[in-house]
Amino acid sequence: MNSKDCVVIGIAGASASGKSLIAKTIYEELCRDLGTDQIGVIAEDAYYRDQGHLSMDQRVLTNYDHPKALDHELLCSHLRELKAGNAVDIPVYSYTEHTRTDEKVTLTPKKVIILEGILLLTDPALRKEMDASVFMDTPLDICFMRRLSRDVAERGRTMQSVMSQYTETVRPMFLQFIEPSKQYADIIVPRGGKNRIATDILKARIQHLLA
């Protein structure tokens, strides 16, 4: 499989901005068009660095909204391997243990790879691997309310810990790294993951790249 046979789409934006929703929508609709074995989704979160050598007290102090928390080098390597026609083993990250598990998820080469993550557009090397990129431009207050509900319900977090993390790292890192990366996006999507027009534009772009 040559690189031109694999289209990589990056979907970035603040935490809880609608990235996963639009990625899921694109995935499901392209699966109907191309087949389920031709589309893959990679979450940037899977590439948080392994912290198994640290105590839990040390792990919770990590700034997970800083680019250094992520192993983008491994992600870039995996994208290049997929483009070359090789399968890759993607790490599995535990939000409750704040480190990688011993498990891996094998991903085989696909026609379309959808990346989604908060810091994708901050890395020049990652941007070079993308054929098109999207930034979810959702107001921060809406993102915060969604994140609060999600992290308490799904990730074993307390309300106080989510609020503290937001004020100490999430919001400052968004302003320092994530929002400035919007300039590198090909498509800026307002109103979250349910923006049907933006979804159709992105699908059309993918189909054009595959033609």
Swiss-Prot record:
ATP binds at G13, A14, S15, A16, S17, G18, K19, S20. Belongs to the uridine kinase family. It catalyses: uridine + ATP = UMP + ADP + H(+); cytidine + ATP = CMP + ADP + H(+). The gene is udk. This is Uridine kinase. GO terms for cellular component: cytoplasm. Pfam families: PRK. Keywords: ATP-binding, Cytoplasm, Kinase, Nucleotide-binding, Transferase. SUPFAM superfamilies: P-loop containing nucleoside triphosphate hydrolases (SSF52540). It is an enzyme of class 2 (transferase). One of its GO terms (molecular function) is ATP binding. Pathway: Pyrimidine metabolism; CTP biosynthesis via salvage pathway; CTP from cytidine: step 1/3; Pyrimidine metabolism; UMP biosynthesis via salvage pathway; UMP from uridine: step 1/1. CDD domains: UMPK. Signal peptide: none annotated. It is found in: Cytoplasm. GO terms for biological process: CTP salvage; UMP salvage. Its EC number is 2.7.1.48.
